[in-house]
């Protein structure tokens, strides 16, 4: 069952990549205690693939939606999308204001990568529940390979994919729960 879910999540991420021609992508799922757990991380140019069917554990703690003082964690881009249900499109993380990109910058320093454009989209199901977040990184011009901002029309396609994906994930979980019930 878990393998089937991982395959579904990977299909969703790969479709988002196809739509946007992005280099990196992360899928987070909402935990029962309202945190965003890293499920799959991929960055093609770094040959970086963790979670999902890779068998590689993701060594990062889940993203807290709420800080220790109980305030919403609006400074983390994934948490912001998970809390508000809003898509966040950032053309250049190094020039963006209002979000904390210190973790991103640390990753870049360690790997020599340059995280630039971000598209972060909540996974909202048919009951309007946010069940996860997809974060895409570094859209690329299909001709030159140069990193570009995520285009608005591609954002709309990804948002549509995410709402369909959230319904598929919710349905898969319900079916799996029913199977367990009848075993």
Label each region the model flagged.
Residues 1-17, 28-31:
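Signal-transducing coiled-coil linker helices
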Residues 21-25, 87:
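Short N-terminal helix-loop-first-beta-strand/juxtamembrane motif that initiates sensory/input modules
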Residues 26-72, 77, 95-96, 134:
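GAF sensory/regulatory domain recognition
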Residues 73-78, 86-87, 91-117, 139-151:
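Signal-transducing coupling segments at domain and membrane junctions
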Residues 124-130, 139-142:
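Flexible loop/coil segments at beta-strand boundaries within sensory signal-transduction domains
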């Amino acid at each position: 069952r878990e393998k089937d879910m991982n395959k579904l999540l990977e299909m969703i991420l790969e479709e988002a990549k196809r739509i946007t021609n992005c280099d990196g992508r992360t899928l987070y799922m909402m935990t029962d205690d309202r945190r965003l757990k890293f499920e799959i991380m991929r960055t093609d140019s770094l040959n970086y693939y963790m979670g999902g069917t890779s068998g590689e554990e993701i060594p990062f703690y889940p993203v807290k939606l709420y800080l220790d003082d109980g305030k919403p964690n609006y400074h983390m881009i994934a948490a912001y999308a998970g809390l508000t249900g809003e898509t966040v499109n950032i053309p250049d993380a190094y020039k963006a204001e209002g979000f904390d990109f210190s973790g991103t910058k640390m990753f870049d320093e360690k790997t020599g990568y340059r995280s630039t454009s971000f598209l972060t989209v909540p996974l909202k199901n048919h009951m309007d529940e946010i069940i996860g977040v997809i974060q895409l990184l570094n859209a690329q011009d299909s001709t030159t390979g140069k990193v570009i901002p995520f285009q608005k029309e591609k954002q709309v396609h990804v948002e549509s994919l995410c709402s369909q994906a959230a319904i598929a994930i919710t349905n898969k979980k319900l079916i799996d729960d029913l199977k367990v019930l009848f075993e």
